[in-house]
Amino acid sequence: MPLTRRRALAAAAATALFTTLAACGGSGGDTTAAVASGTTAVTVGALSNGAAKEVTINVPVVDSIRAQLPPQIRDAGVLNVGLGLLPAGSPPLGFVGTDDKTLTGSEPDLARLVGGVLGLEVQLNNATWENLFVGIDSGRTDVGFSNITDTEQRKLKYDFATYRQDNLAFETLATSNWAFTGDYQALADRKVSVSRGTNQEKILLEWRSKLQAQGKDFAVEYYPDNNAVQLALESGKIDIYLGPNPGVAYQVAQSADSPSPKRSAGTFSGAGESLQGLIAATTKKDSGLVKPVADAINYLIQNGQYQQWLGAWNLGNEAVKTSEVNPPGLPITNT
């Protein structure tokens, strides 16, 4: 189906869905409607089962930013947003809400706020991590909001509009005395889990190569989702999980009163030891969308909605002062 035709159908379907939800008194879904002018009310932290403090944030359409949109997106009135949360989600970044259908989390909520500034209906498309990028490559997805790290390798295919610091954390059982203080030598002889295709995997495998050159090693284990990772930690199949700091902080808080409490055993920049990592909205390279997305994020930063969003999800310590387009990211060779 031609892209323009598909967008038109998506816009019509999204409008119909929003009208139905409003008539029933519903609160959200995988489509968030915005108006081409005026103000949109976005409920941040909805259906989060206590992971966030629910707050309604008003977002006006900014005509000067909307005018920068690629014509096919502006005319269709829909922003197709990609999320890489399948199969089990990743609280607090993104997961299925308490109604068992609505996608909630810090990442979809920011996408909804950006859509409000741009005067676009936000259509959330959830996929596996790998298929998130397939969607962007194919044009089915306009932009990814899914804790995507700015890396130089990814810049070969994508443009980035940054919106949060990228910090990684090492999760262990609370009973473990292992700690990471910046020296990868501490990983020797440990069993470590990480997600495939991520910047943290790249960093971890480079550390492993350096240790192997010294005659040392550690095991790298992969699991299909975060639930399996937590079970592996609790059963002793792994010693350490390396993942996004917000997710580790969430697991530590959730497990505090459980039989197997967890703790954060240290953090590391998602861009390596010489650069502060950054999380970014991700568009197909040279699509023309990255600048209006960055400008929309900067509008939210300058007018306080960004701070409300971070506060609702307890991510204030990962705030950035400005959204940048394609700043330096994790080097292709992190040496």
How would you name each of these model-derived features?
Residues 19-23:
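C-terminal motif of bacterial Sec signal peptides marking the signal peptidase cleavage site
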Residues 25-28:
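Bacterial signal peptide processing site
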Residues 35-144:
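Extracytoplasmic small-molecule ligand-binding "clamshell" domains
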Residues 38-63, 111, 116, 176, ...:
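Extended ligand-binding regions for polar small-molecule ligands
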Residues 88, 101-117, 148-150, 167-225, ...:
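Bilobed "Venus flytrap"/periplasmic-binding protein-like clamshell domains
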Residues 121-186:
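Acidic, polar ligand-binding/catalytic clefts
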Residues 148-155, 204-206, 210, 239-275, ...:
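A ligand-binding cleft/hinge motif common to bilobed small-molecule-binding domains
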Residues 165-172, 256-295, 316-335:
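Periplasmic-binding protein-like
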